[in-house]
Regions:
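Conserved short loop/turn motifs at secondary-structure junctions
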Residues: 1, 29, 180-181, 281-290, ...
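A penicillin-recognizing enzyme superfamily signal
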Residues: 3-13, 17, 39-56, 61-64, ...
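Active-site SXXK
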Residues: 7, 158-159, 182-210, 216, ...
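A generic secondary-structure signal for well-formed alpha-helical elements
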Residues: 14-22, 196, 200-204, 215, ...
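Short active-site loop at a secondary-structure junction
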Residues: 143-149, 172-192, 205-208, 239, ...
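C-terminal substrate/ligand-recognition segments
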Residues: 144, 148-161, 189, 195, ...
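Conserved catalytic neighborhood of penicillin-recognizing serine enzymes
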Residues: 202-265, 309, 321-351
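Mid-domain, small-residue-enriched loop/turn segments at the edges of structured enzyme/sensor domains
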Residues: 222-230, 261-298, 307, 311-314
């Protein structure tokens, strides 16, 4: 469809443009012995990650005898075989349905040595495959440094999935970042905390001090108390709930989860469409739950749809050649939140994009406000359509998220490396407003 084409182009344009290039510049500042991983990684942990990637590669499996180099049939078809020169080898057994190909058997040690030798190969880039000469080990590090993305757009009233971009290139990366991958969702979870507070009597204009809130953890926990910081480490002023959500303030969100409890928030998130398990810990307020992009967008769509969750579907109906319907999905529809509260949450989420007013500082700010302002450095600025939103950034800039909400369409985007130990070194670069929002 046209919308699917727009979505795929948006993902490609952003990653192939400035984002991947800025990530590679960021990686150059890291010591060679740790890149592309974060600098604090333990050398043994780094080596373990690389070993897993090596053994998962087709090149290794073909050498070790777990994959046929000729027809790519897996281990069931492959049996030990004595080659004509007397050496031990492998046979893609024709009696099992294999192609009959034979090749020399190699040990793990021999494969490790082979992975350090340069060979001609094609490697992935967002601008197209590149012919180069690399050792297979260096090609693993190259793949680790690739940024990935997922995007899904859902029509709130019908649950129809209008666009689904599971990854950046199916030929090279057979993994779905929309319905399969579960990652920590960061601050995109906060609207469910604020919705719980509003449903139980809070008002968007209620004022809270921007100061640290500490919550006692179960006995034996280390540390014994949870006291989250704001990402900008700015404290002191009095802010409204609306301003706190628009600017993703951890201090106020922690106060809400302390006052209203984790169970109420978890129950609401499930009612709105979250299906994954959510840990019963206070830090869910800041997004430690690992969810799929699909369920997160579905729950945001319920907020737009007056609090009513409509189960997502990819098929509207199937007809026979005469136009008679032979299949129509039976979608689950349920009210997860009352209409009034859902409306007020959406109004608060508009502040993310439009900005929310802070009486004490005399400023209008929101984490997604760059969508509204013109800039020569961005090609997505000056957007004027009515929109709500929520940015999200997980710990150490591992994942970047953005939820964009309009009356007719809710779109969610995730951006990050496949391996959580590969990430931007600064929040300026790694925040969801920079990595995911532009898509």
């Amino acid at each position: 469809s046209r919308m699917q084409g727009y979505a795929e182009n948006a993902v490609h344009q952003h990653l192939a443009g400035e984002l991947q290039a800025s990530f590679e510049r960021d990686l150059r500042d890291r010591p060679e012995e740790v890149a592309p991983f974060f600098e604090e990684i333990d050398p043994e942990a780094r080596q373990a990650i690389i070993d897993v990637a090596m053994r998962d590669s087709d090149r290794y499996k073909k050498g070790i005898g777990k994959l046929c180099p000729s027809c790519n049939r897996p281990g069931f078809y492959i049996t030990p075989h004595r080659l004509a020169d007397g050496r031990d080898g492998h046979l893609c057994n024709g009696e099992k349905g294999g192609c009959g190909h034979t090749w020399l058997a190699k040990t793990d040690e021999e494969m490790r040595e082979a992975f350090d030798l340069p060979v001609a190969m094609k490697v992935f880039s967002h601008r197209g495959a590149v012919d180069t000469v690399l050792s297979p080990m260096d090609s693993i590090l190259h793949r680790k440094a690739i940024l990935h993305a997922g995007l899904v757009s859902i029509e709130p009233a019908t649950g129809y999935v209008k666009a689904w971009v599971g990854g950046i290139d199916f030929k090279h990366f057979q993994y779905d970042n929309v319905g399969q991958s579960r990652r920590q969702v960061g601050s995109t979870f906060k609207p469910f905390v604020y919705a719980t507070a509003l449903r139980l009597g809070a008002e968007p204009c209620d004022e809270f001090p921007n100061q640290k809130t500490c919550i006692d953890l179960p006995p034996g926990s280390d540390p014994p108390r949870w006291c989250p910081d704001n990402s900008d480490e700015d404290y002191g002023e009095i802010v409204t709930l609306e301003y706190a959500l628009a600017n993703s303030m951890n201090t106020v969100t922690a106060k809400l989860i302390k006052d209203y409890g984790t169970k109420r928030v978890i129950d609401l998130a499930h009612a709105l469409g979250i299906e994954s398990d959510i840990p019963n810990v206070p830090s869910i307020a800041l997004g430690v739950a690992q969810l799929t992009l699909q369920e997160l967008v579905s729950a945001n769509a319920a907020l737009v749809n007056h609090g009513v969750h409509v189960e997502p579907t990819y098929i509207a109906r199937i007809e026979d050649r005469f136009g008679n319907p032979i299949y129509e999905p039976l979608q689950e529809i349920r009210e997860g939140l009352d209409d009034r509260t859902a409306y007020r949450v959406i109004q608060m989420m508009k502040g993310v994009v439009d900005g929310a007013w802070n009486e004490e500082t005399g400023t209008t700010m929101g984490t997604g406000i760059r969508l509204r302002y013109n800039s020569d450095k961005r090609d997505y600025d000056g957007i004027r359509v009515p929109m709500a939103g929520k940015t999200g950034t997980t710990q150490n800039n591992t994942d970047g998220w953005f939820m964009g909400l309009t009356p007719e369409l809710v779109t969610g985007v995730w951006v990050g490396a496949q391996d959580p130990t590969v990430r931007f070194s600064t929040t300026r670069l790694g925040q969801g407003a920079n990595t995911a929002l532009p898509i």
